[in-house]
Amino acid sequence: MKILVPATSANLGPGFDCLGLSLKLFNETQIQKSGVFSISIGGEGSDNIFLKKNNIFVNIFYEIYEKLSGKKDNFRFIFQNNIPLSRGLGSSSAVIVGAIASAYYMSGFKVEKERILDEALIYENHPDNIAPATLGGFVCSLVEKNKVYSIKKEIDKDLAAVVVIPNLAMSTEQSRQALAKNLSFNDAVFNLSHASFLTACFLEKKYEFLKFASQDKLHEINRMKNLPELFEVQKFALENKALMSTLSGSGSSFFSLAFKDDALALAKKIQTKFKDFRVQYLEFDDNGFEIC
């Protein structure tokens, strides 16, 4: 079997832990039954020995496969990782979702996306990345009694993303330590109103309002202090036809949204101005993970 799982960008400014979308950048994993266990890693993380010795995908896969099938089989895993690691593009969510879905498939069980999403919550307790990695598109989610509830909206085909990827790994756990311990009532209301309005902008295609709807007072400023150049990236993107520009997930990557022609031009301009950063033009994925 082969499974493709997309990269994701979460929060989108004010939608902390609840909003996310899916990008056409995929981790590809092939799994075959084998006489002996083996693992091969290409792409991102291929030079990381730890990923071979203690691979999260493999650990989750075997845990679920053995629970479902009652068997202890050996498999050959071939990973082609295209999602940058620990850069706020959902690399951990892609691993979790991919491992669970693969385990269900190889156990002979029906792969139901709602079930996969609920199981993924066990390993990542916020749905902003795992939901778009599973469903694709723009997704708004909440958790109620250990169950994920998500509403998906396909993303306008005229839009594209420009993702700026610094050479700075930042785990979600590290990034959360930078968050403020307390929040004022006014700032809480600010984020509630902006996250709600941002969601409405995507649903109703009111893209002209995204620039201010995507503002945040909960997490971005504290997280971006780790890499102050991102404030310059954000300002530059918004001055060059980005509809919105926000920290991607917990960082360190930065996500900008624009109409396709503008996005292509913006990617070139950012790469020229910020030469130390990797820049990618990406279209949006509306399917979530796919088993081939």
Swiss-Prot record:
The answer, when asked if Nucleotide-binding is one of the entry's keywords, is yes
Kindly list the biological process annotations in GO that this record carries. Answer: threonine biosynthetic process
Q: List where in the cell it is found.
A: Cytoplasm
Q: What is its main location?
A: cytoplasm
Top-rank taxon: Bacteria
Keywords carried by this UniProt record? Amino-acid biosynthesis, ATP-binding, Cytoplasm, Kinase, Nucleotide-binding, Threonine biosynthesis, Transferase
Give residues annotated as binding ATP.
84-94
MF-aspect GO terms: ATP binding; homoserine kinase activity
Query: What is this enzyme's EC?
Result: 2.7.1.39
Q: In which pathway does it act?
A: Amino-acid biosynthesis; L-threonine biosynthesis; L-threonine from L-aspartate: step 4/5
For this protein, the record's Pfam families field holds: GHMP_kinases_C, GHMP_kinases_N
Please give the GO cellular component terms listed in this UniProt entry. cytoplasm
Which InterPro entries does this UniProt record tie to the protein? Answer: GHMP_kinase_C_dom, GHMP_kinase_C_sf, GHMP_kinase_N_dom, GHMP_knse_ATP-bd_CS, Homoserine_kinase, Ribosomal_Su5_D2-typ_SF, Ribsml_uS5_D2-typ_fold_subgr
Q: Does the keyword Amino-acid biosynthesis apply?
A: yes
Reactions catalysed? L-homoserine + ATP = O-phospho-L-homoserine + ADP + H(+)
What family does the database annotate?
Answer: Belongs to the GHMP kinase family. Homoserine kinase subfamily.
Q: What does this protein do?
A: Catalyzes the ATP-dependent phosphorylation of L-homoserine to L-homoserine phosphate.
Protein name listed in UniProt: Homoserine kinase
